């Protein structure tokens, strides 16, 4: 029979399908040849088996059909064993057969395998693998230190196959077992049904051996198993087959949880987190590798068992030390940022180096690039937190517990001393980057309910913030994980203990956590930004001056400027990532809605329309910490300074902010802290359209904000609120805190130009006199004789006075300009006796320095350098006088200003008006007013002479003037005139005689003395009228 016929017979045999190929059938026959000869006498022929014979295909081996048929069952088993051997070789790339490859068919077997020589010797004649010895074979393969040295060719092909060598000789056993798992999965989809159980068993063996490897890694020489696990996951993420790896890991984790006798599951997995920690801490924000590691952690936070280990792993050694949280794995991630790692040290900082050598466009491109990475980074952190919150009640409790403890341990970040002692600060608390990133992630968690009309928003329960004295178990039951909030000052004092619910929802916890995080992080960074900005301006001026004078300090100043500019750009970039800002604005607008609803007594889940007058129910505000409102204001002020385009693109939501400002600015019942209410004026100034700014394509327009303001339905109530807070400023703090009061009033001026309202303000420009003296000394050369140190001190003093003078002059320009504007329409408020005295005193004091004998003291080299505009001031003051001059009471009050008024003061003012070319009608009107006031002054002089001999009982003890409305002070029991004590209390809320606290409602009229004074006055008047 020819070879062709022989092959045809094989192919027609129904049992040929048991073999992988014709060559395999021949090989099988060769293996059986000797066995059949030995057994031919013992195995009788069976006619039933003849139909299934394969003898026709084996003529060349001299076998008959009957001989093959008699041993069918044996043959079938052998065929199956042969296929199992091949399958094991394909899955595990190992073999016991090192025979000549030319004798092997090459069909169905891998091209390269690791030859297990020791095991082959041990098994002697058996050169195939089966299910009884495969586990031993796998173990032997895993113990090989260099499997690449044991590779053999399984086929006669001479083609170089590097991938086959790499796969079979894989040295890293964890990666090897994963590859075996993948090959086993593939086999399961391909093998015949009779081999399927064996393929599944092989797959299970990869899992069980991986479990063994993880439980006893010490027995595998030079194998860092946990490093391999991390590297495998890293490679899978980068190669887009991560799901395959996680499928494998899921089964391994399940197997590990079933066998914790040798090592517990956390003990097995903690080394993995150690590796991630050591690798991540050295990565930068803009390194792609960072995001692959974050994806690994994202998987771990989705996998319930790994998530538990992760949460256990990130617990700090000392929970009361805020800085320790930064050293945990989650803390290390949160610390990654474009901010400086070591404050003030720009060396080795990867961002914005040598900014003066970069064009604005290059800086903008770098900023945009960082923002892209930041957005991705914040999304990863958010997903991690979200996974842990949603995975199970246990993981939710653990991550909230961690966050609550972390914020409590870092509460000291807000203390004043913390900013003044940075070296101690950074040993005690987590970094600014930590809180900025945490805040960004928490903001994302809040977005589902950060919509003005969200019903979920109003489920926030403020009593959460005043709970105290809870143990850990109670916190878990009630879902209260924040600590120490009960020590925070609330918007108003509580009059009664609130009713606490059984537990709190996640909206309440999220809002409280997020707001406090922003308070600890964003708020502090904003303060730093402002200071950096101021220092940059100061350095720039000093650098320019040094260059002009060819000072050797110029280079040093330039270096300082470069370093500070790097810090500024890094900080600004970190704080202005667009999505974070938008999320924060969404939160703050929602907070404005929430606080307004609480302020009008709404305790339901649906918002109530705002209407005036406001209802009385607002007790819930007693449980809302002040920093909720402070954050809102601080963020909007930040946007105005550093990211104004966000305000314009979100203008429609600003109406809710206006509602908040309208209600709280003028309502001491709803917001007790006058400093906080005064700050709301700055918030209003921040969100209002600034129509005087220079148009620029890079600066957003104000069209949308203008529309919101023009259509605001509660403009009258907003103006009234501003008036109230303006008055309250006079009752705030120490009477000598001029700078603070300047800051409070400054934002009100542009607001009052834009919306009707009113205010008055007093300030001093005496600093100009000090500048004048120092400039004279400098010009005369008197400074040249000073030592360098003394000269520097003088220069610094001059610069300081110049800054102060510029600051005060801006305030004076704004104050007087606003008053001249307002008094054209509003008069009654300004002619009130208490207020009129203060306004007149201020105006006369100005005139005395602007047109009187002291005017020379205010002449400096360059008025514009200090924003000093004397001509405009004189004109505005005269306008105020003319606006209010029709009021008899006001005119009569002018001469009573004994400090600055004199009969010649107004005459000198007329002379200056002519000199600065003011209109003739204005000059004539002011001259007439001056004559009228002089007449009233003469009349008052005559009256004072008439009453000059009044007894001391009738005289005010402070002013030594005759009292018209005597009142008794409750503490000191001293009698003073009502106008005197009222004026005193505007700036100092104490009894002037014993410094006891005092308010106007505590004083009592001295009716008896008043009647005595009136009788005496009547008698004196009668005596004067009688002819001598």
UniProtKB/Swiss-Prot annotation:
The EC number on file is 2.3.2.27
Entry-linked InterPro entries: Ub_conjug_fac_E4_core, UBE4, Ubox_domain, Znf_RING/FYVE/PHD
Q: Name one GO cellular component term.
A: ubiquitin ligase complex
GO terms assigned for molecular function: ubiquitin protein ligase activity; ubiquitin-ubiquitin ligase activity
Q: Which GO terms describe its biological process?
A: ERAD pathway; protein polyubiquitination; ubiquitin-dependent protein catabolic process
Which PROSITE patterns has this protein been placed in? U_BOX
Where do the segments described as Disordered lie? 33-57
Copy the domain comment. The U-box domain is required for the ubiquitin protein ligase activity.
Please identify the protein, giving its name as recorded. Answer: Ubiquitin conjugation factor E4 A
Which species is listed as the source? Mus musculus
> What taxonomic lineage is listed for the species of origin?
Eukaryota, Metazoa, Chordata, Craniata, Vertebrata
**Gene name?**
Ube4a
């Amino acid at each position: 029979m020819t070879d062709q016929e022989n092959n045809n017979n094989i192919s027609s045999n129904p049992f040929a399908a048991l073999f992988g190929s014709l060559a395999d059938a021949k090989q099988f026959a060769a293996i059986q040849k000797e066995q059949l000869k030995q057994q031919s006498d013992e195995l009788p022929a069976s006619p039933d088996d003849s139909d299934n014979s394969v003898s026709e295909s084996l003529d060349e081996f001299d076998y008959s059909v009957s001989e093959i048929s008699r041993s069918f069952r044996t043959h079938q088993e052998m065929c199956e064993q042969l296929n199992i051997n091949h399958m094991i070789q394909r899955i595990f790339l190992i073999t016991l057969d090192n025979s000549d490859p030319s004798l092997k068919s090459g069909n169905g077997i891998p091209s390269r395998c690791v030859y297990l020589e020791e095991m082959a010797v041990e098994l002697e004649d058996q050169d195939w693998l089966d299910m009884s010895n495969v586990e031993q074979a796998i173990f032997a393969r895993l113990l090989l230190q260099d499997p690449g040295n044991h590779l053999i060719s399984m086929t006669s092909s001479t083609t170089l196959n590097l991938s086959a060598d790499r796969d079979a000789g894989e040295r890293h056993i964890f990666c090897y077992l994963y590859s075996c798992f993948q090959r086993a999965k593939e086999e399961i989809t391909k093998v015949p049904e009779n081999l399927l159980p064996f393929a599944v068993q092989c797959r299970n063996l990869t899992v069980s051996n991986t479990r063994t490897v993880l439980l006893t890694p010490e027995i595998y020489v030079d194998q860092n198993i946990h490093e391999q696990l991390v590297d495998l996951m890293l490679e899978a993420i980068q190669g887009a087959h991560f799901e395959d790896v996680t499928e494998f890991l899921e089964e391994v984790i399940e197997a590990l949880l079933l066998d914790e006798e040798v090592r517990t599951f956390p003990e097995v997995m903690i080394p993995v987190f150690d590796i991630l920690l050591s690798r991540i801490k050295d990565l930068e924000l803009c390194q792609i590798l960072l995001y692959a590691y974050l994806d690994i952690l994202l998987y771990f936070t989705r996998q319930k068992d790994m998530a538990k280990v992760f949460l256990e792993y990130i617990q700090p050694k000392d929970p009361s030390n805020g800085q320790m949280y930064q050293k945990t794995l989650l803390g290390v991630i949160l610390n990654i940022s474009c901010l400086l790692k070591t404050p003030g040290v720009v060396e080795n900082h990867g961002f914005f180096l040598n900014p003066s050598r970069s064009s604005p466009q290059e800086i903008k491109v770098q900023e945009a690039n960082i923002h892209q990475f930041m957005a991705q980074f914040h999304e990863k952190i958010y997903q991690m937190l979200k996974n842990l919150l949603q995975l199970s009640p246990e993981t939710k409790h653990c991550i909230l517990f961690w966050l609550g403890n972390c914020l409590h341990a870092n509460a000291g970040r807000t203390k004043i001393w913390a900013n003044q002692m940075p070296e101690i600060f950074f040993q005690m608390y987590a970094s600014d980057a930590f809180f900025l990133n945490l805040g960004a992630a928490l903001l994302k968690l809040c977005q589902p309910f950060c919509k003005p009309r969200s019903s979920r928003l109003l489920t926030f329960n403020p009593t959460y913030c005043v709970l105290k004295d809870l143990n850990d178990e109670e916190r878990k039951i009630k879902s209260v994980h924040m600590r120490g909030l009960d020590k925070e000052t609330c918007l108003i004092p509580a009059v009664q203990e609130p009713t606490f619910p059984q537990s709190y929802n996640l909206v309440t916890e999220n809002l409280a956590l997020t707001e406090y995080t922003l308070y600890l992080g964003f708020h502090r960074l904003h303060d730093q930004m402002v200071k950096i900005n101021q220092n940059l301006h100061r350095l720039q001026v000093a650098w320019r001056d040094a260059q002009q004078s060819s000072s050797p300090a110029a280079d040093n100043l330039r270096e300082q400027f470069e370093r500070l500019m790097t810090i500024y750009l890094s900080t600004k970039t970190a704080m202005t990532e667009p999505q974070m800002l938008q999320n924060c604005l969404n939160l703050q607008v929602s907070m404005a809605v929430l606080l307004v609803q609480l302020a009008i007594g709404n305790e339901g889940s649906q918002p109530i329309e705002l209407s005036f007058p406001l209802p009385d129910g607002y007790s819930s505000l007693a449980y809302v910490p002040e920093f909720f409102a402070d954050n809102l204001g601080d963020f909007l002020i930040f946007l105005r300074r550093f990211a104004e385009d966000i305000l314009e693109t979100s203008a429609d939501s600003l109406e809710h902010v206006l509602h908040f400002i309208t209600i709280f600015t003028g309502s001491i019942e709803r917001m007790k802290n006058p400093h906080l209410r005064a700050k709301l004026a700055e918030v209003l100034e921040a969100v209002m359209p600034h129509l005087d700014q220079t148009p620029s394509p890079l600066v957003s327009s104000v069209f949308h904000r203008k529309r919101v303001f023009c259509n605001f339905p509660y403009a009258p109530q907003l103006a009234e609120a501003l008036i109230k807070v303006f008055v309250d400023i006079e009752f705030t703090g120490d009477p000598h805190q001029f700078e603070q009061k300047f800051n409070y009033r400054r934002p009100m001026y542009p607001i009052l130009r834009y919306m009707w309202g009113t205010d008055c303000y007093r300030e001093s420009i005496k600093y100009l006199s000090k500048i004048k003296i120092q400039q004279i000394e400098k010009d005369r050369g008197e400074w040249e004789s000073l030592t360098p140190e003394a000269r520097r001190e003088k220069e610094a003093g001059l610069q300081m006075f110049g800054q102060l003078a510029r600051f005060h002059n801006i305030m004076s320009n704004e104050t007087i300009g606003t008053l001249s504007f307002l008094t054209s329409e509003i008069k009654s408020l300004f002619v009130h006796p208490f207020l009129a005295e203060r306004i007149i005193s201020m105006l006369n004091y100005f005139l005395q320095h602007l047109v009187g004998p002291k005017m020379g003291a205010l002449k400096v080299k360059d008025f514009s350098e200090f924003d000093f505009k004397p001509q405009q001031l004189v004109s505005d003051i005269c306008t105020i006088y003319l606006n209010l001059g029709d009021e008899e009471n006001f005119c009569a009050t002018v001469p009573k200003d004994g400090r600055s008024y004199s009969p010649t003061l107004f005459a000198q003012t007329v002379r200056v008006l002519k000199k600065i070319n003011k209109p003739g009608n204005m000059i004539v009107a002011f001259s007439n007013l001056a004559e009228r006031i002089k007449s009233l002054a003469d009349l008052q002089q005559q009256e004072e002479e008439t009453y000059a001999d009044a007894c001391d009982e009738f005289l005010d003890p402070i002013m030594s003037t005759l009292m018209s409305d005597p009142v008794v002070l409750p503490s000191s029991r001293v009698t003073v005139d009502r106008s005197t004590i009222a004026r005193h209390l505007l700036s100092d809320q104490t009894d002037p005689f014993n410094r006891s606290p005092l308010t106007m409602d505590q004083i009592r009229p001295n009716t008896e003395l008043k009647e005595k004074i009136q009788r005496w006055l009547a008698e004196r008047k009668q005596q004067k009228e009688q002819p001598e």
